[in-house]
Amino acid sequence: FPLVLWLVPTTTIRKQTVDALKNPRHPYRAALDDAFSGRVRVFDIGDFSQLLPHDLRSNCGVVVGTIQTLRVKDTDGRKVYAHHEMLEPHFTGVPDKMPGLEMIEAGRGAGTIKFSFANLMHLHRPLMIVDEAHKAVTGLSRDMQLRVNPTAIIELTATMRTHSNILHSVSAQELKDEEMIKLSAMPSEHMTW
């Protein structure tokens, strides 16, 4: 089953996305349930310790987090990059020196694989969805992508960059017709400006 890492720009959008994906009546969840025969598990990134190997083997897993949670220069002090014993079952059978995985640098366990959320993502090569991707274009974003090791990246944006590989485009009218525009746009001309 696939694993999806869905990254959004703010905590508010993260909560809204998690709520939508957990709601069986929401169109997003309904589409996932149809595609995977109801075998879908949705997690907030803050609850990554609840991920079990069985969840990832037997279900489509969707982990929703903010871009800022993973996009850092220094990984020290970030929970998603820290060693967590409860993630050990995910690393059973993984070779000791697997390329791309962060290792414990000092102290007990030095030189062994760090049982971290980021390493778990690296192993599973998730599909990465980046909401409002135009806000996520930095060198740090590329570093984060290398750490996570996604199979593919889908960028959702209203502001495409040049040289983007556009798979699908939606007009503002189509969004309005589907009631996906949250604020009404009422442009007016101000002669005093």
List each language-model region with its residue ranges:
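RecA-like P-loop NTPase motor core of helicase/translocase proteins
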Residues: F1-W193
